Amino acid sequence: MKHFLKLLDCTTEEIYELLDLAATMKQYVKEGKEHHFLKGKTLGMIFEKSSTRTRISFETGMYQLGGHALFISAKDSQIGRGEPTQDTARVMSRMLDGIMI
């Protein structure tokens, strides 16, 4: 499993691959082509504090890429009952394709 926490964790080759993919995706949008790179993928979004812009940007991005985003607030999860965010994320990672904290 590859975690993307910061750019410094990536090799130069991985950074170039990300930039190439971003350029391809941008070109698809410009040309009006279908670009469902995340079709069938589900992202769990864990929020300890509400963030409207972050939630909307991730939900919109997942939708545009053909995937689904699930919003999980602290009060709707074990986080609201004192469980560490890392434990909740570990359990959720067994059922989801990606987790955004």
Regions picked out by a protein language model, each given a short descriptive name:
Residues 1-56, 60:
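Positively charged, low-complexity intrinsically disordered leader regions
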Residues 42-43, 47-98:
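Active-site cofactor/substrate anionic-group-binding motifs, chiefly glycine-
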